[in-house]
Amino acid sequence: MEPVIVVGAGCFGAWIAYRLARSGHAVTLVDAYGPGNNRASSGGETRVIRMGYGAQEIYTRWSWRSLELWKAFFQRTDPMLFRETGVLWMAREQDPLTTSTLATLERVGVPHERLSRAQLESRWPQIDFGPIMWAIHEPGSGVLMARRAVEAVVGEAEREGVRYVAATVNTAPPPAGRRLEAVTTGSGERIRGATFIFACGPWLPKLFPDLLGDRIFATRQEVLYFGPPAGDLRFASPAMPAWIDFGEEMYGIPDIAARGFKIALDRHGPPFDPDTGDRVAGQTFDAVRAYLARRFPALRDAPLVAAEVCQYENSCNGDFLIDRHPEFENVWLVGGGSGHGFKHGPALGEYVARLVAEGGTIDERFQLATKEKVQQRTVY
C-alpha cells in the first residue's frame, strides 16, 4: 500500500498510525517532542473515560467502542493502564445535561445506575453532596493512564512496522499543486508519502495559521493533586470513583498510584502556546481549594502535592475536526480534541483509517466547514 505520514504522536495520531499499520499501510509517525510528552494535550498521568455525553449519542457510542478497544489493547500490553474506578455524574434537581445523558445511556444500552441522594450518601459518606440531589453511576467506566497509554500505542505501532521519527516538520504545505509530496523535518530530511495526516493537537493552528489559526483554540488548563491523610483510603479507588460536577465545572480522579487526589476546573483557560508557555500552576488554586473544602471536607486542609499545566485544543463547540485540507487532496486534518478527546483515540483511529483506506462521507459535525471562529461550547 502507498505510504502514509502521520504528524503528531499524541493519542489521535498514535491510534491512527497503529490502525493504518495493522491494515497493511507503510506508516511514518513524526513528533517533535515524543509520545505523551508534557507539552502535548495527551500528556499527563490520567484521563477519565466515561460514556455519558448528554444527547450527543455519537460520542457515547465512540467512547463505548473505545473502551472496548482500550481494554483489548491493554490485555496485550499492560492491564494496569486502565483502572475501572467507575464514574459518578453529580446532578442538581433540575439538570438538563445529566437528564439527557441518562436517556442516551438507556437508549444505547450502556450499563449505569441512577442513584438518589440517600443512596449517594450511603455509598460515599466521604462526599458532602450539598446541592447534589441525584447522580448517574457508570460502574464500568474509569481512568486511563494517559502518558503511559500513548507510549504503549506508539510502541505497538512500531512493532507493527511504523517508523517513528523525532522531528519538527515544515509549517505548511508548499503553495503549488493539489497534492503534497513530502514534509521536511527541522534537520532537512524530506519524508515523502502518498497521504499526510496532521493530528498534532495544539500545533495545528501553528502549522496551518491561515486555515486554522482562528478555528482551533489552544487554552491553558491546570490540574491539581491533593494528598489525603496518611492511611486514609477513602479517596483512593475503589472507595472513590472518578467524578464529574458540571454544575460547578469541576471533575476529579481518585488517588491512583499514590499520585494524590486529582481535581481540576473544567473551564477553558486563557490562550496558550504549547511550545513556549510556562507551566507553573496556581491560577485556579483558590477556586479548586474552595470546592475541595465544600465537597470533600476531610481534604479541607490536604496539602497540594503536585500540579500540572496542560492545554485543551478546542474547536468552536467541542466537536472534533476530521477533514481533508481544502487545497490538498491528500492531506488530512485531525484534531479539536477539546478536552474530551483522549478517551476516543481508538474509535477515532478506526474512523480515520477507514476514511483514508476506503473513502466515504465524513460526518458533518467533523467537517472543517462547521468550525467557526467564536467558541461556544456544546459538547461536554
Residue ranges and their predicted role:
Residues 5-7, 190-203, 349:
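Short hydrophobic core segments
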Residues 46-123, 132, 249:
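Dinucleotide-binding Rossmann-like beta1-alpha1 core, especially the glycine-rich loop
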Residues 137-195:
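Helical element adjacent to the flavin cofactor pocket in flavoenzyme catalytic cores
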Residues 1-12, 28:
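Beta1/beta-strand and adjacent pyrophosphate-binding region of the FAD-binding site
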Residues 61, 89-97, 136-155, 277-286, ...:
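Short beta-strand to alpha-helix junction loop
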Residues 18-22, 78-84, 195-330:
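Active-site substrate-recognition segment that forms the wall
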Residues 21-42:
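Glycine-rich FAD pyrophosphate-binding loop
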Residues 291-380:
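C-terminal catalytic lobe of FAD-dependent flavoproteins
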